[in-house]
Design a protein with these regions (language model features):
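Cap/insert and terminal regions of metallo-dependent hydrolase folds
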Residues: 37-134
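Core dinuclear metal-dependent hydrolase active-site scaffold
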Residues: 1-48, 141-145
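Class I S-adenosyl-L-methionine
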Residues: 131-143
């Protein structure tokens, strides 16, 4: 079953997904600029999350990008920064959430170690290792359940 949900992004009718086989649930959230209550409710109870961690705020601010692009990426309809993604993770965390993939990392405005640092507090404990998707090669298959 696929359950699409809307997100705040500067595209026409942007949607993300909650996928389920009836027993297990995967939430996919990328290309969102800010947190909405509908987004959080759509991701509740997932066994696995693929979560955008697009940029580090400081790296984006200090980047060579023009001011207009920085404003777009970091704005309400742009992309999720590491700290906002950590807030989403904390809001969606429950005992059954076993798998987390950080995805859509900017090659210019983020680093895997910054993502790990931002998500560490919420993701601590007896869960599977945090997987960080490589912007070029993705990540290996993960068995959910």
């Amino acid at each position: 079953e696929l359950q699409p949900f809307t997100v705040a992004h500067d595209a026409e009718e942007p949607l993300q997904l909650r996928c389920s086989d009836g027993a297990r649930h995967l939430g996919v959230l990328t290309d969102a600029g800010s947190i909405t209550p509908h987004m959080l409710s759509s991701l509740q109870g997932c066994d696995a999350l693929l979560l955008e961690c697009n940029h580090d705020r400081s790296m984006l601010a200090g980047s060579r990008y023009p001011a207009s692009l920085k404003a777009r990426i970091g704005g309400r309809y742009g992309h999720l920064d590491n700290d906002t993604s950590a807030e989403i993770l904390a809001a969606c965390l429950h005992a059954g959430l076993r798998h987390l993939v950080a995805a859509h990392l900017s090659e210019h405005n983020n680093r895997p170690e910054l993502v790990r640092e931002a998500l560490a507090c919420a993701w601590a404990g007896a869960r599977e290792e945090l997987v960080i998707a490589d912007p070029r090669t993705g990540f290996d298959w993960i068995k959910i359940g």
